[in-house]
Amino acid sequence: MCGIVGIVGHKPVSERLIEALGRLEYRGYDSSGVATIFEGELHRRRAEGKLGNLKTRLKEAPLSGTVGIAHTRWATHGAPTECNAHPHFTDGVAVVHNGIIENFSKLKDALAEVGTKFQTDTDTEVIAHLLTKFRRDGMGCLEAMHAMLKCVEGAFALAILFEDDPATIMVARNGPPLVIGHGDGEMFLGSDAIALAPFTNDITYLNDGDWAVVGKTSVQVFDIEGNVVTRPRHISLATADLVGKGNHPHFMEKEIYEQPEVIARALGHYINVNDSHVTTTSTDIDFAGVESLAISACGTAYLAGLIGKYWFERYARLIVEIDVASEFRYREIPLSPRSAALFISQSGETADTLASLRYCKAHGLRIGAVVNTRESTMAREADAIFPILAGPEIGVASTKAFTCQLAVLAALRIGAGKARGTITDDEEQVLVQSLATLPGVMRQVLNDITPEIELLSRELSHYRDVLYLGRGTSFPLAMEGALKLKEVSYIHAEGYAAGELKHGPIALIDENMPVIVIAPHDRFFDKTVSNMQEVAARGGRIILITDETGASMSKLPTMHTIVLPDVAEIIAPMIFSLPLQLLAYHTAVVMGADVDQPRNLAKSVTVE
């Protein structure tokens, strides 16, 4: 959500700031802006809509200056208008902000009482006015910054310019991530390392509560009490070439087709094909001594965790508690120190998931983080890190991160079963060999089913409501398929457990309701066929996704049947996710939707 970049340099920065913002577009936004200091004065350009609109403004009215900040805004307080776009200016101060100031109404009222006039509907403007007030009260820039931070409550990442201090940018972090990049005679800042990849890979990650003064050749970091602190520098693995589309029209399509490659890389970290065993690392959780397991995540990551719940319960005989992170942390769950917790997040910065992680850590649980970004806050705060190694995922709708999360959870399920004595050596070998076939089968399926999915998507695009059904691990897949379709095509879709059909959804079924049934030939197949018969009896349009054995056994007429190869149970969820992803993608393309940046959505939700 939102993106922040800044440069303290020795040459003009406006074009480089816009270039860096382009690498943050995946985070979601609805307006953008840039500000620089030139000849002792602040200057800015802002625009509603896509970044191209801001580029046009800059062509019409270029900005000079070697120090500047820029921002992509995802509206939380105030409509997505140019007036509400960042940076916000008050006398001698420019502010960009990612997050939510929870006490802004109280602060706004207090400022209004002393004559402050507000120009926007945003919470961010409060920050600028506080800084201006403290400066007028006689405080220096550093003192005013510290005083402001003691006033505001909520989640925020900030970058601030002062006209009186034209050679620095002041920054702060409390929740949303903020990184500092060390260059050659210049310094950079951004919401993540990807934004800075063409400029530097020498990165300092700020901790929650940190604030800093960034100069041309150095950064001084303070904690919330104003004490100088030292934060380590890291070499980031993010590179600029990882965020291109290649030969694909959209990032989402590129990332769908990258899955065989990234799955192979992920599995290589967790299984040893030569001796058919899962690998152990120094960060493994000791599942043998764990009484129960808690899993928490948001969105697609939660659905990966739900599949993980089925696996850990059935094959490791673990009691598993799972909930969406926004609910998990408020339920006051009885937690035992002999329990462990897994938190799943592509970015490793998801606000609700991070809050749930901290809740469990405070209760003494051992924490595992299944993340795509090893330098993320969740990874740094966890006891055990389980990287999914998917590489940067730019499309807002998660595809390759989802299947990599499943691959990692599948390997962990084997390791947990071995540790707890519920999986034998022979069973481990069979499971590992099955996992090893996954990249090749994925590649085959993507090649085989794409043409028929393209045709089916044209028909599906004419409907406004779609129901997805599944049993067992296919139930979370049904919810994931529905989520993908609604995210990128804006078609209303819901995923249900097939056994719940008679408890409500069946009332909606008629000839205008496509019903996508996910039915591998497993122990649930016959019951799922019974549900399909109920749909057919009411005129529902069945789209069946099954395997070769299932297709040979189902005699019901369908609108379309997608036939996948027979595969081992452990890799079936990853294989069956592919037609769901492709169907959502191609339907959205047919409908002319913005596939990579769906309306109102953000890739990384860093506020609650």
From Swiss-Prot:
GO BP: carbohydrate metabolic process; fructose 6-phosphate metabolic process; protein N-linked glycosylation; UDP-N-acetylglucosamine metabolic process
Protein's name according to its UniProt entry: Glutamine--fructose-6-phosphate aminotransferase [isomerizing]
Disulfide bridge positions per record: none
HAMAP family: GlmS
A Gene Ontology term for the protein's cellular component: cytosol
UniProt keyword terms in alphabetical order: Aminotransferase, Cytoplasm, Glutamine amidotransferase, Nodulation, Plasmid, Repeat, Transferase
GO molecular function terms noted in the UniProt entry: carbohydrate derivative binding; glutamine-fructose-6-phosphate transaminase (isomerizing) activity
Stretch forming the signal peptide: none
Organism (species): Rhizobium leguminosarum bv. viciae
Cited Pfam families: GATase_6 (PF13522), SIS (PF01380)
Protein's UniProt keywords contain Zinc: no
The enzyme's E.C. designation: 2.6.1.16
Domain SIS: residue ranges: 283-422, 456-598
Underlying gene: nodM
Highest taxon of source: Bacteria
SUPFAM superfamilies (UniProt xref): N-terminal nucleophile aminohydrolases (Ntn hydrolases) (SSF56235), SIS domain (SSF53697)
The protein's role, per its UniProt record: Involved in the production of the root hair deformation (HAD) factor specifically on medicago.
